[in-house]
Amino acid sequence: VKRQQRLILDTVLLGIIGALGARLFAFLLKETEILLLGRLAGYAPPGVMDGAAGGEVMGQHGLWLIPLVTTLGGLLSGMLVYGLSPEAEGHGTDTAVKAFHYASGVIRARVAPLKMVASALTIGSGGAAGQEGPTALISAGFGSVYASAGKRTDEERRLLVLMGMAAGLSAIFRSPIGTAIFAIEVLYSDMELDAAALLYTMVASVVAYAVNGLLVGWEPLFRVPPDIGAEFVDYFRYGALGIAAGIVAVFLPTVFYNLRDAFHSLPVPPHFKPALGGLGIGLIALALPQVLGGGYGWIQQAIDGRLTGFILLSLVFAKMIAFALTVGSGGSGGVFAPSLFVGAMLGGFAAHIFHQPAAGFVIVGMAAVFGGAARVPLATILMVTEMTGGYHLLGAAALTVMLSYMIQVALSESFRYRTLYEAQVPGRADSPAHHVEQLECAVHLLDTSRVCMPPTCTHLDLRALIASGIPVDLPDGKRLVIGMLKQKSSYVGKRVQQVFPPRKRERLEVVAVFRQGHTLLPHAGLLFQPDDRMMAVTTPGNWERLAEHFSPYTFDVGSRGGG
């Protein structure tokens, strides 16, 4: 109870810090955009920040200075990031997810402030990236540093990282429920959640939403018509949009990561690569200035039905390339806003084809493309409806996003890059964070079992031995082993106690079976399934004879980063 009370207090603190950090970053980004794009290039996109209404402004030089400014922004960002903290490059959400899975939630203290400045330079100079990645990393980074300063456990540090991520995103997108779910859904590429953390991410995101509302108001990010909704026949049109969005969602990660790989292979110092990406964006902007920045103002114009069909379709592809150039070259920014932009333009084009009002299709299109490409369908449905206030479209959004998600998963199976977030793992069973929990459970089982452990073997030693996959020699001449059941083994589908009867435990005794993140005791009804990990005590010769059924297995428990 005391631990839970402390964590609830942590959620309130992180909610407040997340909201303040998000507002500070938004202010810094706005001022940088005014300085670089506004004063140097003489250009202001419509709706600077937060999707507010406003018109496009061009100076006396038109668009011709934009390539110089985008190149300058990329150069400054690259010099800052690669000179001081390379992990601040790219889209920050992926860095936070990677820290959760592989680094015990450790994010270096310098990353958050560097990410804030580098992202402001990238996006403020016209880079086609969003606020979500930097905000997520800034607030998650504070949660990590706060946990390390308080000497919290690895488990609590990971939880505080998720709380921070939810809080920052809630403030920036004004979406308390969707972002709470996003923080626990974005960890996995399959339909899985870290549900145990939902209580804490929800409280943190609601606190951040409330603090942000107190500071800047309670209006949704985008304005939608009050009579927006969907009739029965519209669901067929939304179904078609879901199919198209799923196809686009397949290619979004592919274009992004292939361009990133191309930049990595260039024989150019990494400090200068974001400048090359910035030059590419600037050249695209000479023809389509709508690709600059996050593009919230242009999304609002699409909702209002003020863009032509040709422009809408052109921007689907132009923004995809522009955002890949920005973030793939090493620029600092998020992938959420560009993905929303692509989906919004696709939805607007669908409305143009179907001769329907644009607002509903733009909103649902935003959710469908990102929900499929990032494989976060549940969170995206809620986030987009909260960001727009379009709650009457919840059913249509659910249908469209789920269709997009299913098509994206099916079609991307043979692709190298299947999701926008490279650090995602398929499910809890694949996360080193949860492998640690399984190992701790295994050690506890050994403590309470009849296994004769070496007297000098501590819990830490035992965890390290089990994680390495090296058999542990026991004083009675037996070995503690871990193996993965092969998919074609004849043991698949048979009861564990049928294969290894308790009466023959002197030859092999099953201690536990690890399956999909859970630790199972070898009870009478437990059946072997492919890829089960079995921990057992056996004789050396007997284990060698079982090699046709079990392959060696090591638990990936990640690495601990520095503070």
Placement of each model-derived feature along the sequence:
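Conserved NTP-handling cores and scaffolds of large molecular machines
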Residues: 214, 410-414, 503, 517, ...
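Alpha-helical transmembrane segments and immediately membrane-proximal extracytoplasmic
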Residues: 1-443
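Conserved short beta-strand edge segments in small beta-sheet-based binding/regulatory domains
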Residues: 511, 544, 553-563
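A structural signal for short secondary-structure junctions
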Residues: 362-363, 373-374, 475-477, 527-529
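Intrinsic-disorder/low-complexity, polar/charged segments enriched in Ser/Thr/Lys/Arg/Asp/Glu/Gln
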Residues: 298, 478-482
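Cytosolic Rossmann-like ligand/nucleotide-binding regulatory domains
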Residues: 482, 486-546, 550
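Long, low-complexity, intrinsically disordered cytosolic termini of multi-pass membrane proteins
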Residues: 431-479, 487-488, 502-503, 517, ...
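A general structural signal for short secondary-structure boundary/capping elements
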Residues: 415-417, 427-433, 528-533, 555-562
